[in-house]
Amino acid sequence: EFAAYMGVDQEKGEPVLMDFTNRKLLEGYFKYVYEKIEKKDGVDFWWIDWQQGTNTAIPGLDPLWMLNHYHTMHSQKKDGKGLIFSRYAGPGSHRYPVGFSGDTVITWESLDFQPYFTATASNIGYGWWSHDIGGHMMGYKNDELALRWLQLGVFSPIMRLHSTCCEFNGKEPWRYRKEVELIMDKFLRLRHQMIPYLHTMNRRASEEGIPLIQPLYYQNPGKWDAFRMKNEYYFGSDILVNPITQPISTATRMGKVMALLPEGTWIDLFTGTVYNGDRKIELYRSLDSIPVLAKAGAIVTLDARTTGNAIDNPEILKVIVAAGADGSFRLDEEATDNVWCSTTFTYKWGDEAVLTITPEKTKKEGMPAERAYELVFTGTAQGMTAQKKKADGTYETLETSYDSDKQCTTVILPMQDIESEITVVTYNTALADNHQVERIFELLNRAEIEFSLKEKIYAIAQKKGSRNDAYLLDQLTLLNAPEDVFGAVKEILTALD
C-alpha cells in the first residue's frame, strides 16, 4: 500500500527513497507502515535505528533529526507524552529520544568508559541516556564483567539489557554461573523497587531541567578533583555512585574504585558503612555490591514489594533514611496521568531523632486508601527504639529490628490512612562505629592469601582502640601484604577519620 501510495512499482523491486522533507512520504510512512503495525500487533514504542540515510533535499538537514521529531509527534498523539528510542542526531537532539552510546564492544575497557559517557551526556542535555548493558558485540564472555555492567545499568537513567544477534551472547541472568545469576536477580529487582524514587527524579528533570545523573563537578564546581573523577556521579538529589569497572583482586576477591567524597558524612546504602567526607578514598567491594553512598540526612523511597512487575503506587513503601544530619525529601507519585500526589518526609537528627511524614490531604483516584511503611535508618548503632505519636498526643511503641551486618535499624509502621500525618521518634539514636575489627575479620576470612599473613594482620587490627590508626597502618605496611589487601584494610580502619 505504501509503495502504491508513493507511485513505486514494488514488483520491480523499486525502493521508496527516504526523504523526510517530502510531506507525502511522511504522511504515507506513518499511515501505511507504522499505524498498521501498531493496530495489528499492539506496538506502542519504537526503536528507530539505521534506516533514514544521510541526506535530505534540504542541504545541512540531518534526516535523523527529522525522523526523531516526527516519531515523537506521532507518539504524542497516542498518549500525550511521546517516547521513542533513537540514535544521537547532534546537539539539540536530546529533546526527542532516549539516547544510547552505540554498539559497545564487550570488554572491561569498554565498560570503564560507560559511566563517564553516561554522566557527561547530561552536559549536552541527554539526561535520558542508556548503554547496552553487558556490551553489544565482539569481545569475550566474562560473568564478572557482565555483572559489573548490570550494576552500572541499575544506577543509570535507563536500564536496558541488549546485544547483537549471537546465540552465545544472551543477557538473561540464568545464562551466568549461579552466584552471578542470584546477584543479577537482586539488582534487577532493586531497580524495579526504585520506581518511586526514579519517578520523582524524572519529574524534577522534566519540570526543572535537572538530570537524574550529574557529574561530580555539578555540585562541587570549586574542587578540581571533582573534574578528574570521571566515573563517579550523583544519582538523584543525594546519592553518589561509584561503579566498579575492573576485575576483582585475586587476593581480596573484591573490586576497587577511587572515590571522592564531598564534605559531610556519607553512608553506603548496601553495607551501612559510615564515611567522613572531604577526601579521596579507595573503596573495595565484593561481587554483590558497588559503592552507592547517601549523604547524611538523605531520604530514599522504594517500593517495598519484592516480586512482580507492578507499576501502581505501592501500598507499602520502604523509606531509607541516612543517619547523621537533618534532611528532607518530597516523593511525587502520579495518581493518574499528569495528576500528581506528593508526600514530604522531614528528618531531624539527634539522640531523639524525629521523622515526619506529611502526605497531601486530598485523596485521589489511583492512590491506595492506606499505606504501610518500612523505615530503614542506615548507618545507625544498635540500641535504637522507636515510637509513633498518636492523635491524642501520647506515643505507641513500634516494632524495631537491627541488622548488624548492614548497620541499619528497621522500624515497621502498619497500614494507616494514606492522608495521615505521621511522626516517628527514635531514641538512643547514634551513628554506627563500622564494627571495624569484625569487618576486617570478614575481609581476611574471604581473602586468598597465606594463613600466617591473615593472623598477623588480624592481630594488628585487634589493637584498634588502644592504638591510633597511623600506628596500625605503619605496622601493616611492615608486613608487605598485597597492595589490595592493605588497601581494603585501610578503608575499614580510616572510614571515619
Specify the residue positions occupied by each region the protein language model found.
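Solvent-exposed beta-strand/loop surfaces of large extracellular or lumenal domains
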Residues: 267-287, 385-413
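Residue-level detector of beta-strand structural context in well-folded domains
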Residues: 230-231, 257, 343-345, 398
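Catalytic-domain carbohydrate-binding cleft regions of carbohydrate-active enzymes
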Residues: 1-289, 481, 488-497
